[in-house]
Amino acid sequence: MNLNQEVIKKVIDYIEKHLDEEMELDNIARHAGYSKFHLNRIFTEETGTTIHKYLQLRRLTIAAEKLAKTDIPVAQIAYEAGYHSQLAFSLAIKKINLYQPKLYRNMGIFAPKQNRMEMAA
């Protein structure tokens, strides 16, 4: 594993540990010891996606699983996923799953869009 991969692993571990918290790229970069621009560049080079997109898709994947497998109210799931409005959450879920949250829930099928990334050793 090269240095960039070690840094990305550290970043992914940090993101996964704090998925349910407010996260700013500045804080993630500070944790990794890099500028946000450099960190985002190497993250994108190593993973093929930006930190923001990874974080967003991980949160939406967890939210989709909650929709499919629990009776937690949609508004609560939206809030837990970092959305301040149910409308914004509904649009984001529909964009990745093609269905509004209530319809997705009624289907009862969970199809993960972004699993946790693992860096090869």
In which residue ranges do the predicted regions lie?
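…primarily DNA-binding HTH/wHTH and HhH modules…
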Residues: 1-4, 91-121
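Terminal helix-turn-helix DNA-binding modules in bacterial transcription factors
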Residues: 9-26, 45-81, 107-121
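Basic/polar phosphate-binding segments, predominantly the helix-turn-helix DNA-binding elements
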Residues: 22-55, 78-100
